[in-house]
Amino acid sequence: MDPNGDYLFRIRTVKAAPIRTLSEALKEILTEANIEIDQNGLKIMAMDGTHTVLVHLRLHADRFDEYKCPQKYILGINMINLFKLVKTMSNNDSLVMFMEKRDTTKMGIVILNGEKQMETTFNLNLIELDINPIEIPPVQFSAIITMPSLDFQKIIRDMGTLGETVEITSASNQLILKCRGDFAEQETVFSVGQGMTVSKSHSEIVQGNFLLKHLVLFTKCTSLCSDISIYLKNDYPIIIEYSVAGLGEIKLALAPAPSKQSHGGK
């Protein structure tokens, strides 16, 4: 492609693999979404079909290898179709996203492999999505836990085979996860140290029950970063934050499970 062509926007990054991972995770949560792109970066703010999960993605313009977007555009994207195009990207590939002035109904995607001197271009059809903007008021969380992303992934996936919900508690300097299934119960306690830190605004115990099937999907983001942040507040959605390989961050919010499912039985 011609880097000096007539584009409305053109973005390039050598971090193709994290974008592939991000696309794979998002397609499990959002079938369709509007991507807002402007001079500051890319943003997705959307809820899943059950109105249980909120996705807030922000990739910053100054973290890309090339970023040219003088004004704001809203791109309606089918996330499943997007992943079909980028799933073949390797760790050594570069990714370019663009829109040409002559055709604003498509987003261009170029996958570049310098080793093989190979360039593949796709043109993804955009869709019209009638989605109302989502505004999130500022919130002070009672506890913020930082821990290794692999540890969180393992415990959530293990519990996902046992029950339907997990009880997550932040008490003192511990993070406690409990799950109850038809054939067994599990409790795992993480204490401060070994990569885990806890920041609390006050000393109250913070506790909530959450559907494991959604948290399991969140863990598809695990390879994006070595550590995650967990934001907790009583009677409020849990938020799991992943860094997107230095490009930005994604926050995944999950509403508490309905009370009838709060004991985790299948």
Indicate where each model-derived feature is located.
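DNA polymerase sliding clamps and clamp-related checkpoint/processivity subunits
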Residues: 1-27, 32-161, 169-266
